[in-house]
Regions:
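Aromatic- and glycine-rich beta-strand/loop motifs that create alpha-glucan
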Residues: 1-23, 241-244
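A structural motif at transmembrane helix-loop-helix junctions in multipass membrane proteins
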Residues: 135-179
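Terminal transmembrane helical anchor/hairpin motif
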Residues: 35-48, 172-241
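Membrane-interfacial helix-loop-helix connectors in multipass membrane proteins
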Residues: 40-43, 116-139
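Hydrophobic alpha-helical transmembrane segments that constitute the membrane-spanning cores
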Residues: 92-126
Length: 244
């Protein structure tokens, strides 16, 4: 069974993927010290430095997972080459698990390990950075679960890409504006909408680290986690029943 795992690994991380990806993830943390002011991290600046698209490491990690899911696994489904893999001596559930580990979990581990070592090196492990890491983790697995679901459901690279980016973009943008409005009105509905875009709440939390805002962030992480798990098992059922 390990031989099949090696085949899948080489397919997804053949040269020069790792040689390019790992240095970019490491260099991406240059944006964090770029927000230094008077030799110290301003909390709100640290939050801005961790927002996806600004934080290059997070963006590259997510992009790699998207590429693996849609343009490797999804491509096999689109052109029918998945049949050759399913004819190997491996159960569908194990094949799905191997693919998920390589497509989603491994890029996340690259980010998590490098980010943790970086924060330890600059002595910045605190409640704010832990909150940022938890929020990104929950959002990452929710987002990749959405992409995986669309990839297996639509079985078209173009349609999966458009559906995934439209869904995630809409959630992130609407959630950003919505959460900002709810913060201003001090509404308890933040507990339900915080999962859509936690960064306005984290930014507000960096200015005023109150327990109420922290509770909203925790609620968002829990909702993201629940949705990610639900979509994961839904995708597993779709893959298990898929006819090739």
């Amino acid at each position: 069974m390990f031989e099949i795992f090696k085949i899948l690994f080489k397919e997804r991380y053949k040269d020069p993927t790792l040689q390019l990806m790992l240095p970019v993830i490491l260099v991406g943390y240059v944006f964090i010290p770029a927000f230094l002011e008077k030799g110290n991290f301003e909390p709100y600046s640290l939050v801005v430095a961790y927002i996806p698209l600004i934080n290059l490491s997070e963006t590259v990690t997510f992009s790699l997972a998207l590429r693996n899911i849609i343009f490797v696994l999804g491509d096999h489904l689109t052109n029918g080459s998945i049949v050759s893999f399913l004819m190997m001596p491996i159960k569908r559930i194990r094949f799905f698990a191997y693919s998920y580990i390589l497509d989603v979990v491994l890029p996340y581990l690259f980010w998590l390990i490098s980010n943790t070592f970086y924060l330890l090196d600059i002595n910045m492990i605190n409640s704010l950075t832990i909150t940022l890491m938890l929020s990104y983790t929950a959002g990452y697995f929710f987002s990749t679960s959405v992409i995986l679901f669309y990839t297996l459901l639509l079985r078209s690279n173009g349609a999966s890409t458009l559906a995934s980016l439209f869904t995630l973009g809409s959630i992130f943008i609407v959630g950003g504006f919505g959460n900002y409005t709810l913060i201003e009105s001090n509404s308890s509905f933040l507990a339900l909408t915080s999962f859509m875009n936690p960064y306005p709440i984290i930014l507000a939390y960096s200015f005023d680290p109150s327990y109420a805002l922290l509770n909203y962030l925790i609620d968002g992480v829990i909702i993201d986690g629940f949705l990610a798990i639900t979509l994961f098992f839904t995708s597993l059922i779709i893959f298990y029943r898929i006819e090739v």
